[in-house]
């Protein structure tokens, strides 16, 4: 038996096959263009995203016989508006990183803000989907016309892909929990929240489970069931082998995303982390998690490269000592504001402590350290099991300097996975569950334990200096009014 997992991510779309022997192999990877039409705005061509999924699906169906089911991982908060009659997008996809709606959210009445937090567990932030959906209805004439005509699809990107592939208008509970429109306890669209954001409830797709016989994809003369669909970070959580309370993972991708399983009901976290649905299998109750992220991690590395301070990630692999922080140089990776636990879109990215003898190497090192220190801040706000190391993956985790500094800043071991494609692996494993089978563990699913070095106490003692740098980035942002 084989499961085809498609991971539609922020920078590319990847397809993998996982068989019942535990072998995970790549079908293909297609990159897509990212658009920045104005400051704070981030968009994708939704047609390009869908075409890439379809191309990889067709390739897999040609090359891989006996595909028993298909699993789809999505970007989470990214949204699309489309014509349900011809399945064509009416506007570019608005990406989770987009900040255009923050000013609208800042103007919400206090009672509305309280209602959003109480019902969804989420802060009123442009990161989440609801304000993006509202913006499309208010600002794109074709979208408003389609709503009046009764043929509008308006939802997170997974719904667009599923509608296009199956003609079913649906999303799953993990993705719906990222919109700010779903009651987190009842796991249904909330009418009051829809009124707050100006998004008619009857425009939204139905909410279903993350696994099970969800829909049927008819393509290339074959009918194959869609057996799993969920947010990419929740798929990665499953791929890490996290199953019980206290199990946690951190993914160092475009942003840093840390999740920890909390149990069968959502909990309120007083440290700025947000409750979310981890997954829900068909016929079962939901499992919940706490989630926190940093908007710009690998994105900050890419930005540093674009400035000419490095040619690739390999240039960031520097000798372990002395750290930039020990030399008085800090970098705050708030290029799109600060997410958990601060939730401050006015914060700005900055290097602090530049001198005449500061080199590009020092600045590169400070970037890695800033990402690691922000990530450690996230982990320490999660209810992580004390007897298990945090499990890590993502492109930045492959950099020895970075992952060692992260372990030192955290002061505890980090379990670094050998398998880099944890999102695809988790989605595929979810696919096996959707077919009523036990997850097929990947044959290369080992790990290396990264233990804190002797420098850890010294680095941890400097955490307060970094916290002050973060506070300075927030104060400077408020002074200059940088938030959209």
Predicted features along the sequence, with ranges:
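Short, conserved phosphate/pyrophosphate- and ester-handling motifs at nucleotide-, phospho-/glycolipid
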Residues: 45, 98, 232
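Active-site core segments that coordinate phosphate-bearing ligands/cofactors
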Residues: 4-6, 102, 109-171, 181-183, ...
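Short, acidic/turn-prone active-site loops that include or flank metal/cofactor-
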Residues: 30, 35, 94-101, 177, ...
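N-terminal glycine/serine-rich phosphate-binding loop of ATP-dependent small-molecule kinases
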Residues: 1-91, 118, 209, 221-228, ...
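A conserved helix-loop-beta module that forms one wall/lid of the active-site cleft
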Residues: 191, 197-212
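Short beta-strand-loop/turn "lid" adjacent to the catalytic site in phosphate-handling enzymes
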Residues: 62-96, 123-129, 158, 162-183, ...
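Residues that line or immediately flank small-molecule/substrate-binding pockets and catalytic motifs
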Residues: 32, 74, 97, 211, ...
């Amino acid at each position: 038996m084989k499961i085809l997992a498609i991971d539609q991510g922020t920078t590319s779309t990847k397809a993998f096959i996982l068989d019942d022997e535990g072998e995970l192999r790549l079908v293909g990877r297609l990159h897509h263009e990212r658009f920045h039409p104005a400051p704070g705005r981030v968009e994708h061509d939704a047609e390009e995203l869908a075409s890439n999924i379809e191309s990889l699906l067709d390739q897999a169906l040609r090359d891989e016989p006996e595909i028993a089911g298909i699993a789809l991982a999505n970007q989470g908060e990214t949204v699309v508006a489309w014509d349900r009659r011809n399945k064509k997008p009416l506007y570019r996809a608005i990406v989770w990183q987009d900040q255009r709606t923050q000013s609208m959210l800042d103007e919400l009445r206090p009672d509305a803000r309280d209602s959003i937090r109480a019902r969804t567990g989420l802060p009123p932030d442009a990161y989440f989907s609801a304000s993006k959906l509202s913006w499309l209805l208010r600002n794109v004439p074709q979208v408003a016309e389609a709503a009046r005509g009764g043929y509008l699809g308006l939802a997170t990107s997974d719904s667009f892909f599923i509608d296009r592939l199956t003609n079913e208008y649906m999303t799953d509970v993990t993705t719906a929990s990222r919109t700010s429109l779903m009651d987190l306890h009842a796991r249904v669209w909330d009418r009051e929240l829809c009124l707050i954001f100006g998004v008619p409830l009857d425009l939204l797709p139905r909410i279903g489970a993350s696994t099970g016989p969800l829909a049927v994809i008819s393509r290339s003369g074959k009918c194959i069931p869609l057996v799993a669909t969920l947010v990419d970070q929740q798929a990665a959580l499953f791929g890490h082998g996290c199953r019980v309370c206290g199990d946690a993972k951190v993914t160092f991708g475009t942003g840093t995303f840390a999740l920890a399983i909390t149990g069968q009901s959502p909990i309120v976290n007083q440290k700025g982390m947000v409750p979310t649905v981890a997954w829900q299998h068909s016929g079962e109750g939901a499992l919940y998690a706490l989630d926190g992220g940093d908007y710009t991690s690998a994105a900050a590395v890419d930005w540093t490269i674009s400035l000419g301070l490095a040619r690739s990630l390999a240039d960031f692999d520097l000798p372990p000592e002395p750290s930039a922080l020990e030399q008085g140089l800090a970098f705050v990776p708030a290029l799109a504001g600060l997410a958990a636990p601060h939730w401050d879109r006015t914060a700005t990215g900055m290097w602090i402590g530049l001198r005449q003898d500061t080199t590009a190497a020092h600045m590169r090192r400070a970037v890695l350290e800033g990402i690691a220190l922000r990530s450690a801040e996230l982990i320490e706000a999660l209810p992580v099991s004390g007897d298990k190391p945090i499990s890590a993956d993502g492109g930045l985790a492959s950099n020895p300097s970075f992952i060692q500094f992260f372990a030192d800043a955290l002061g505890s071991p980090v379990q670094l996975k050998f398998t880099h494609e944890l999102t695809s692996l988790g989605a595929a494993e979810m696919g096996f569950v959707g077919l009523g089978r036990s997850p097929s563990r990947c044959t290369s699913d080992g790990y290396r334990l990264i233990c804190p070095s002797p420098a850890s106490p010294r680095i941890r003692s400097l955490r307060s200096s970094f916290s002050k740098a973060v506070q300075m980035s927030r104060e400077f942002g408020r002074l200059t009014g940088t938030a959209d």
